[in-house]
A protein has these predicted regions:
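Beta-strand-enriched cores of mature, soluble protein domains
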Residues: 1-149
Length: 149
């Protein structure tokens, strides 16, 4: 199986909304207030209004459920839904929770984004499978997204 880079996506996240314990774990909602993305075939900004509905499971794994709207540099809107997992050693996850920068090789942060585009120029996004590797930042995250060929 081969892949090639699709884009690098950086999202801005203010302090999250902590719902607390729910039947399947601990729910935290992280609003997405903006960001940028850039790749060989598309670039633009992340519109405010999306979010990452995370669930911290009892085994320490964080389930990610990111849903955002991308606006390309020529005004096209693209919906992106990305699901994934983040986990690692307790001391590394504690450092991330404190807002510290942590080497992304020290923890697992993988996603599988899907896209919906109505503009023909970006319709190729509707027909691909992608994978991403994430990096937690003090005020958001960076996702390096590859398309599977």
């Amino acid at each position: 199986m081969t892949s090639r880079p699709l884009m690098t996506l950086q999202v801005e996240v203010p302090p999250p909304q902590k719902l607390g314990p729910v039947p399947h774990g601990t729910r935290v909602i992280a609003p997405i207030t903006g960001g940028v993305f850039e790749g060989r075939r598309l670039r633009g900004k992340v519109l405010p209004g999306g979010g990452d509905w995370t669930l911290l499971r009892s085994d320490g794994v964080l389930e990610l459920d990111l849903r955002i709207t991308l606006e390309t540099d020529n005004g096209a809107l693209i919906f992106m839904a990305s699901f994934g997992l983040r986990h690692g050693p307790p001391e590394v996850l504690a450092a991330i929770a404190r807002g510290e920068s942590v080497d992304p090789s020290k923890y697992y942060f993988r996603t599988f984004p899907r896209f919906e585009a109505s503009v023909e120029k970006y319709a190729f996004l509707n027909r691909m499978i992608c994978v991403g590797a994430g990096e937690a930042l003090p005020d958001g995250a960076i996702h390096r997204i590859d398309e599977i060929l």
